[in-house]
A protein has these predicted regions:
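N-terminal catalytic scaffold of extracellular/periplasmic and nuclease hydrolases
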Residues: 1-287
Length: 287
C-alpha cells in the first residue's frame, strides 16, 4: 500500500474504530440523507452517485471500501477490513517513509467491545500506545467517567499521547479540562493540532458520566484558539474533530485560519476533502 510522497509535513488520521481490535466485515450505508443545502452533496452520496462523483470504477476495491454495492461478492473477494494489527503495519510503514509523521485519533476509540468494557478501556489504551497514536480527542471515551478519563490522560498517556479539546470546560468556572491544542515541530515546521470533542456529549450520553464538564461547538472559542496558535508561530493549523461532517463543514465556513479538519463521529467515508471557503481563505474538511 504505497502513497506518493509529497510535502514535508505528514499527518495520519484514524477515527471511530469503536474498540474493534480485529478485522470485521463492514458494509457502507445505502442511504445517507442530506437536508437543505446539503442534499446531494458530500458526504451525503452513496452507491453509484459516490462512484461517479469521485471517479471510481464499479466492482473495484475503492467501490467496496466506500459503497454498499455488490457487498456480498466484494466481501468474498476482498475479505474483512480494519484490525489493529493491519493498521499497525500501515502506520509503521507510513512513519518510516515520512520522518516526523504523527498519528491523530479522532475519538470513539476506547468503547464498543466487550473487552473494552470489562477492562475499563485498558485494552484500548494499551493498544493505542502500541499503535503509536500521538494526539487524540474524545466522545464515547467520556462514558467511562471523568475520573477514569483523567486517570488515563495523567498516568497511561503522560509522555505518549496528548488529549486535546478546546470545547470542554468545567461547568463551574469554565476552565479548560484538557489542553485546547498542542504544538508539534515536524521537520522544522510548527504545526498546531486543535481538539474538538463531540459537542453534544451531555445530551447524547448519560449526563451523570460527565457532570462537571460542559461541551458545545464553541465556534468563537475555536477562533480564539486558532488565533492563539497562529500567534505562537504555527505555520500549519489542523483540527481533529468529533463534530460530525456537517457540523465541521459549517465550522469551516465560520472560523478562519484552519488549514484542515480531520473529522469523525458520522462515519462518512470521504475519499477526498471538501474545500470550504471562508473569510480567511479556505479549509479542507474530511471524515
Amino acid at each position: 500500500y504505497d502513497l506518493p510522497k509529497f510535502g514535508n509535513v505528514s499527518l495520519l488520521h484514524m477515527t471511530d474504530c469503536h474498540a474493534q481490535l480485529l478485522p470485521i466485515y463492514f458494509r457502507e450505508p445505502n442511504v445517507n440523507l442530506g437536508f437543505g443545502d446539503q442534499f446531494g452533496k458530500v458526504p451525503h452520496l452513496v452507491g453509484d452517485q459516490l462512484l461517479k462523483h469521485f471517479g471510481f470504477k464499479p466492482n473495484s476495491i475503492e467501490a467496496h471500501a466506500y459503497t454498499y454495492l455488490n457487498f456480498e461478492k466484494a466481501a468474498q473477494t476482498y475479505g474483512k477490513v480494519g484490525g489493529f494489527a493491519h493498521l499497525a503495519t500501515l502506520v509503521k510503514r507510513m512513519k518510516a517513509t515520512r520522518p516526523g509523521a504523527l498519528l491523530l485519533d479522532g475519538g470513539d476509540t476506547w468503547q464498543g467491545s466487550g473487552t473494552a468494557l470489562w477492562s475499563n478501556a485498558q485494552d484500548m489504551v494499551d493498544a493505542c500506545k502500541a499503535l503509536g497514536v500521538n494526539v487524540m480527542t474524545l466522545h464515547w471515551e467520556s462514558t467511562y467517567g471523568e475520573a477514569r478519563v483523567k486517570e488515563i490522560e495523567e498516568k497511561d498517556f503522560a509522555g505518549h499521547i496528548d488529549i486535546v479539546a478546546q470545547n470542554v470546560k468545567t461547568t463551574d468556572f469554565g476552565d479548560p479540562v484538557f489542553k485546547p491544542y498542542v504544538m508539534k515541530n515536524i521537520n522544522g515546521i510548527p504545526v498546531a493540532i486543535i481538539g474538538q470533542a463531540f459537542p453534544y456529549t451531555p445530551i447524547a450520553n448519560p449526563r451523570w458520566q460527565t457532570p462537571n464538564w460542559s461541551f458545545g461547538v464553541q465556534d468563537e472559542n475555536m477562533q480564539k484558539t486558532v488565533d492563539e496558535a497562529r500567534a505562537a508561530g504555527a505555520q500549519v493549523v489542523v483540527v481533529i474533530s468529533h463534530n460530525g461532517m456537517d457540523v465541521d463543514l459549517k465550522m469551516a465556513s465560520r472560523v478562519k485560519g484552519i488549514d484542515a479538519i480531520f473529522g469523525g463521529h458520522t462515519h462518512d467515508g470521504v475519499p477526498a476533502p471538501v474545500v470550504v471557503k471562508n473569510a480567511g481563505g479556505q479549509t479542507l474538511v474530511t471524515n
